[in-house]
């Protein structure tokens, strides 16, 4: 329902006219001093006429009255008598204002506004008066108060309310950047069915968008649409920008679509915004279509920004052909390529592994422009790092300085990461020291070095770096201390780890869940369950919520210290109290814990509970179960698990195949083991060293050294290194086969690749040589053991003692017996049998009896 007030119909757009002879307000009158007998000039100035018969003759006394006698009512009477002559009314207002003072608080000002907006000749003056009033008032008057004054003065003095007065008031607020008041004015105008001028509304919408009051801008527009006011292209543009700022490109396109349905003709700016919206939705077909449409309609050549948007989207979608075509099209239109588009193209080339094209474009940028910026260098340096081309990365890093670009923390960190990954530790530390000295390294870079130092076991150097950071004003954060604390825990130095934890508290930093997880895990790794649980108590007493990471650490730790039942109980409590979103990781720890404790039935029960709780087992779950079942001679169940994995679409990985193959090899079922090995290869998996070792051991146990050696050769061909276990198994089998030459060659090869013989391989060789009567070589091995500080075990001593017995060297045999005792190695029954039989056979019953 429309307001009872009558509003004058006015054009939706106007051109404000400048005030002629516009002078600023001042404290002195701009008119001649009044006299007892006003001159013709005074009458003309005040009344607009020299006639004594002026319609307001009754008010002539006003000119000669004392200032204090000039009240608002008298001024209003004169103004009302000049309502048909707005310019005369304004002259009188300006004349009376110095005598009376400010009229803005009363009705005088608003009566004048109504008079001025009634004539096109004084529109501009009305607007200027309102602008001055709003901008000079302190505090800024409330919009609702001024609207009320407009409406009330119209009713009181018989004016038809002109919507122009409201719009000029809106203009005054929007020009003074009083956006909230401007919004209030629009809302009140809409309530009064007054149609706002769109240039003024657009200015208000623009202010709302600029300050990110996007929802408020949309709501204001919606209220206008509700009364049938749609706005113009500028309005549509502002609303599209609001949607794009909110990352709602589909909404922006919908705004444009509705505008077109209402008959709007999109201009070049709306096309550009539509292209940007399509790029954000990666609808490149539509974006390219809009570009063509812009050209066909000859609105304008797409701008650099528009072309850049489509190029960026094409690169993001991996469509480099389109991106390059658009770049060429842009250049042919006479539009230069900016650094954003050029850098995006370099990024695309790098992603396509086309480094040549990337560097060609970079060289062109250096020669012809646009000049590469820091982001351009970042893309290339990061690409070089990922591909291990660190010398090239360093070259571009130095080139930045030549071009006057200051490397950032990102560049330093990227190169340091690359050096560390490539095991170029000295280069990494050198660059770090340089950046640290120049102040370029921040806590982020320092934390990377701290982490690396601690992984290398260099916790002393890490601790020293913490001190240097503080002295340089680089405050270590919780991550810094976490790195050092983790380093101490890895070295099982829990006392130092606790000192670091205390430092965190002393520095006023707040330990996070990861901090506590490090300490808890460190305690469990040291089999210190009590202190681990004390750390948990410290968390709860400090009102720190224990999250899933910490709970998982506790469960995993309990399983490691043989408290798997307690871990399962904790898990059950957490599920009941809904304190943890249980994953298969928790159950995996429990299943593995039960297996290591020999509780296979409990492990299977935990698996069944896991499935009952709706948690899907993963490959780790199945591998743990199959490994345990195989080691407990339950191959049928292990194969059932394998079949279940396949039925559920869980692919076997190398550890899973390894568990089954090892199980079959230990049972000498080499046919099944070989079948699984073939299946593994068909799946495209690469066998691991443990799998090869299991197969070699299996064939060795069957005496099939040909097959064992074939696997050894394949292992080397696949690029895998043999470990001590591999060589021990092969040498043992070859010695049993009597192939001493090949066994000796493998032993030499083993030492050549840097493997140091241990007690086990010495035992195998000594026993093998002893059984073949190679006593001289046995003694040689025995001496080599001592030289390498490997203590012979009782089996080796027995073999050497037996050899001396067979050689008739009983004194040396007894000396070795005494040596065993001196080294704390207890002789076994075989030792005594050798020595006793030797004494009796040599008619030394007394010595034999003493044994």
UniProtKB/Swiss-Prot annotation:
In chain numbering, the transit peptide falls at: 1-26
Keywords attached to this Swiss-Prot or TrEMBL record, sorted alphabetically, are: Mitochondrion, Repeat, Transit peptide
Q: Which NCBIfam families match?
A: PPR
Record protein name field: Pentatricopeptide repeat-containing protein At3g54980, mitochondrial
Q: What domain of life does the native source organism fall in?
A: Eukaryota
UniProt subcellular location? Mitochondrion
Q: Which GO terms describe its cellular component?
A: mitochondrion
| Main localization (coarse) | mitochondrion
| PPR repeats by residue range | 162-196, 197-231, 232-266, 267-301, 303-337, 338-372, 373-407, 408-438, 442-476, 477-511, 512-546, 547-577, 583-617, 618-652, 653-687, 688-722, 723-757, 758-792, 793-827
């Amino acid at each position: 329902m429309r307001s009872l007030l009558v509003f004058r119909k006015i054009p939706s757009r106007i051109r404000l006219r400048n005030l002629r002879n516009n002078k600023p307000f001042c404290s002195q009158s701009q008119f001649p001093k009044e006299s007892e007998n006003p001159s013709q000039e005074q009458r003309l100035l005040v009344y607009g006429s020299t006639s004594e018969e002026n319609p307001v003759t009754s008010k002539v006394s006003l000119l000669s009255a004392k200032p204090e006698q000039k009240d608002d009512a008298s001024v209003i009477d004169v103004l009302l008598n000049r309502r048909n002559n707005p310019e005369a009314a304004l002259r009188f207002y300006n004349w009376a204002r110095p005598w009376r003072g400010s009229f803005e608080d009363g009705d005088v000002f608003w009566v004048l506004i109504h008079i001025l907006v009634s004539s096109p000749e004084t529109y501009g003056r009305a607007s200027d008066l309102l602008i001055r009033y709003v901008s000079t008032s302190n505090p800024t008057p409330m919009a609702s108060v001024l609207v009320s004054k407009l409406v009330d003065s119209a009713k009181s003095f018989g004016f038809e309310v002109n919507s122009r007065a409201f719009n000029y008031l809106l203009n005054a607020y929007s020009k003074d950047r009083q956006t909230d008041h401007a919004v209030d004015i629009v809302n009140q105008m809409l309530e009064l069915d007054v149609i706002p001028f769109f240039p003024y509304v657009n200015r208000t919408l623009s202010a709302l968008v600029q300050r990110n009051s996007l929802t408020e801008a949309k709501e204001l527009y919606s209220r206008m649409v509700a009364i049938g006011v749609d706005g113009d292209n500028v309005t549509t543009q502002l609303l599209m920008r609001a949607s794009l700022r909110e990352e709602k490109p589909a909404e922006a396109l919908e705004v444009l679509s509705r505008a077109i349905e209402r008959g709007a003709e999109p201009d070049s700016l709306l096309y550009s915004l539509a292209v940007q919206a399509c790029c954000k939705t990666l609808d490149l077909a539509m974006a390219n279509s809009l570009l063509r449409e812009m050209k066909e309609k000859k609105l304008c050549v797409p701008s650099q920004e528009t072309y850049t948007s489509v190029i960026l989207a094409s690169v993001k979608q991996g469509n480099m052909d389109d991106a390059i075509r658009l770049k060429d099209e842009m250049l042919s239109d006479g539009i230069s390529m900016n650094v954003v588009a050029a850098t995006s193209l370099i990024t695309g080339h790098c992603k396509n592994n086309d480094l040549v094209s990337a560097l060609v474009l970079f060289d062109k940028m250096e020669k012809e422009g646009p000049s590469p910026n820091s982001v351009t260098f970042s893309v290339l340096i990061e690409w070089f790092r990922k591909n291990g081309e660190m010398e090239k990365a360093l070259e571009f890093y130095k080139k930045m300085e030549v071009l006057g670009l200051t490397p950032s923390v990102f560049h330093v960190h990227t190169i340091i990461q690359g050096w560390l990954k490539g095991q170029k530790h000295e280069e990494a530390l050198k660059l770090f020291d340089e950046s640290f000295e120049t102040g370029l390294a921040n806590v982020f870079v320092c934390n990377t070095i701290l982490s690396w130092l601690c992984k290398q076991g260099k916790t002393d150097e890490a601790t020293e770096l913490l001190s240097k950071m503080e002295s340089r004003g680089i405050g270590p954060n919780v991550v810094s201390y976490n790195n050092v604390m983790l380093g101490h825990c890895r070295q099982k130095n829990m006392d130092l780890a606790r000192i670091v934890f205390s430092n965190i508290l002393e520095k006023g930093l707040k330990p996070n869940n990861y901090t506590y997880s490090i300490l808890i895990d460190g305690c469990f790794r040291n089999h210190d369950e009590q202190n681990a649980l004390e750390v948990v108590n410290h968390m709860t007493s400090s009102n720190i919520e224990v999250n899933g990471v910490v709970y998982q650490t506790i469960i995993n730790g309990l399983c490691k210290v043989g408290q798997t039942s307690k871990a399962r109980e904790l898990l059950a409590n957490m599920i009941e109290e809904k304190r943890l979103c249980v994953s298969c990781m928790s159950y995996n720890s429990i299943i593995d814990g039960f297996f290591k404790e020999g509780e296979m039935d409990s492990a299977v029960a935990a698996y069944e509970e896991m499935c009952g709780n709706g948690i899907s087992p993963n490959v780790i779950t199945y591998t743990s179960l199959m490994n345990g079942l195989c080691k407990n001679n339950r191959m049928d169940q292990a194969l059932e698990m394998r079949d279940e994995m396949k039925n559920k679409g869980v692919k076997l990985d190398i550890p899973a195949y390894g568990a089954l193959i090892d199980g079959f090899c230990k049972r000498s079922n080499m046919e099944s083991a070989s079948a699984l090995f073939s299946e593994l290869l068909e799946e495209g998996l690469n066998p691991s060293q443990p799998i090869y070792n299991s197969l070699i051991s299996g064939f060795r146990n069957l005496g099939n050294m040909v097959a064992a050696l074939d696997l050894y050769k394949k292992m080397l061909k696949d690029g895998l290194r043999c470990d001590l276990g591999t060589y021990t198994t092969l040498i043992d089998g070859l010695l049993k086969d009597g192939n001493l030459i090949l066994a000796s060659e493998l032993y030499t090869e083993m030492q050549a690749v840097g493997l140091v013989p241990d007690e086990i391989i010495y035992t195998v060789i000594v026993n093998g040589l002893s059984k073949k009567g190679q006593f001289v070589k046995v003694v040689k091995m025995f001496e080599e053991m001592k030289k390498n500080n490997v203590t012979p075990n009782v089996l080796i001593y027995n073999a050497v003692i037996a050899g001396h017995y067979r050689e008739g060297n009983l004194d040396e045999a007894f000396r070795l017996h005494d040596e065993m005792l001196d080294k704390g190695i207890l002789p076994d029954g075989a030792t005594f049998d050798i020595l006793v039989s030797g004494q009796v056979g040599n008619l030394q019953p007394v010595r034999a009896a003493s044994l």
